[in-house]
Amino acid sequence: MADRRSGNIYAKIPAAKKKEMFRTLAQNKNLRIERIVSFGQATPENTWLKERRDEWVIVLKGAAELRFQKTRRRVILKEGDYVLIPANTPHRVEWTHPRRKTIWLAIHSA
C-alpha cells in the first residue's frame, strides 16, 4: 500500500460542507481505499455513476440510499450496512442523511 499506513478514519472531518469530501487512504495498482464524507448530497438528477472497478462500500456513520439503473433496485444503507457494486454498474446516490454527516468507506478493486 502507498503512503498512509495508519491513521484515524474519523480525523479531519469538518462539521459541514457544501461538497462531498473524498480522501484516498491507501492505494496500489489493484486497490484503492477511500473515505467519503457526505453532508446531505445526492447524485445530480438524471446522472448515473459507473466505476471501472468493483466498489464495495459501507456506511460507518449516517445513512444513504443507492439506486441501480438496470434493476431499479434501491438499497437503504444505515450504519454498518454495506453493498458490493460490480464494475460498470450504473448507480446513483438518491440521498444522504440531511442532518448528519454520512461517512462511507469505499474499497475499489480491480
Where are these regions (language model features)?
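A short, N-terminal "cap"/entry segment at the start of jelly-roll beta-barrel domains
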Residues: 1-48
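Short histidine-centered beta-strand/loop micro-motifs
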Residues: 23-25, 45-51, 67-69, 75-76, ...
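Short strand-connecting beta-turns/loops that link adjacent beta-strands
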Residues: 30, 71, 98-100
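Residue-level recognition of conserved beta-strand positions in structured domain cores
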Residues: 35, 61, 68-70, 95, ...
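Short beta->alpha connector loops
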Residues: 39-42, 64, 89
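Short, conserved beta-strand element in jelly-roll/cupin
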Residues: 50-66
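Short acidic-glycine-tyrosine-enriched beta hairpin
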Residues: 71-87
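Ligand-binding loop in jelly-roll beta-barrel domains
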Residues: 78, 87-110
